[in-house]
Amino acid sequence: MFIRAGQYKSRPRVLAGIFLRSRDTQAERARRKAEEIEELRRDRQHVQRDLASAQEKIADMKIQIVQLKIDNQQRQPPVLPHDPALPCHEFGPKIISVCVNLAANVGLRASVRCMDIVLAWLGVDERLPDWTTVRGWLMRMGVAALEAPIEQADDWIWMADHSNQIGQEKALAIIGLRASKMPSPGTAIRHEDVRLLMFEPGINWKTADMSAAYERLAEKAGQPLAVLTDGACELRDGALTLQNDRPDTLLVGDFKHHAANVLKQVVGADERFSKFTSQTGSTRSAIQQTELAHLMPVSVRPKAGFMNLSATLKWANMVLWHLSHPHSAAREQITPGRMNDKLGWLRSFRDDVARWSRCQDVVSLSVTFVNEQGLFCGAADQLSRRFRSLELCGASQTVADGLLEFLRDHELKLQDGQRLPMSPEILESCFGLFKQLERQHSKGGFTSLLASFGALLQLATPESVRDAFSRVSVKQMRTWVSDNLGTTVPSKRKTAYAESKTVA
């Protein structure tokens, strides 16, 4: 300091005072800045606390808003989706598709009742169609499915069968699927995999009639790659005419029907089996109104024959087990004397039932294999290897040989890489859906409801409803019924009763 003091004109004492005052001034300024910084820090902390509090309040308010929306929705009655009515209709395609799908599953009258129950539960005041209206919708959908354009292709596989109830009328149904669109091996054919190609009611379905029907369908869809039928000769022989225009058209037999025939040849030819079935029928009548009713033999339709043998054998094995286990829960309140008197006869058939069950095991395994895998080169060899998992005896080996021979005979008709279905169970299932729709009327003869058959294969959607109703009017649907059904058995019955009242 003093070394450089010569630079200044003022005295050192004056300079020292100036420097001391400057230092004090800077110190005071620094102190004030520090106080300002501390005050700003405190303000920042207050702001952060206020911000956190505000964020908590916002989160709480969001929760309250969600709850208020829920409460508001609960207070307001539900409304059905927007569904403008179709032209010249009182209802929209959404409600129509729902009613049609319900009718196909639970019945016509029940479909409207179900809708009424659901809407009442939701608190929705909505007018519903009458069940007769739903019936008309279903019939229009069926006719539209039948008259929809068929894709021309050379790999159609047809499945043909007849359905009849009472009277002379039979309905010919032919469904089809493309070989190129078959489900992958291991997957059975579903309703959505097929489409209705032909559906014609008629009285006479002889070989010539079937040939004409096949030719009419071939004009629309092209010559088929294969035709699958059951054992009915008119269905099988009628398809021979198709080979005139396409020699490589394959005629495929129904594996399940053949399996039932093999069972009939092996098991049905057993004298013991005739005695067994006779005793089974007597037992059913004897115990159906007693304390043994839960052990009653199953009811088997005579027409089903050996196709439903498994249910009877399952019953026999169940009863034989309980005969050997007197303390089973199923035998409570049944005295040993009553059990032996009514069901003890099965003991003498124990070995027979075991033998027949082994035959049925062969058939069950084979039918499942064919349903899932189809017919292909090497199918018989694969099935033969699966038989190794079964306990075979002389009778069951005979059944196995008969089924393998049937497969090998069909394999000879195939080209390399071809794979075809060998069971029309999907078509039989379609007939079952129709009988389910008819309910108690399924034994009274065909009615105009037959027009709805084509609507049962696919679920209705708003889009399919629009398409079907744009192509088939009520008048066209009634024309189809008039042209194809004529006077039905129920109509004739109604006329007969009406005439008798008039005369009386």
Q: Where are the regions a protein language model picked out?
A:
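RNase H-like polynucleotidyl transferase catalytic core
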Residues: 248-264, 417, 423
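A polyampholytic, Gly/Pro-enriched intrinsically disordered region
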Residues: 267-288
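Basic, short loop/linker segments at the boundary and entry of helix-turn-helix/winged-helix-like folds
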Residues: 3-14, 28, 37, 63-101, ...
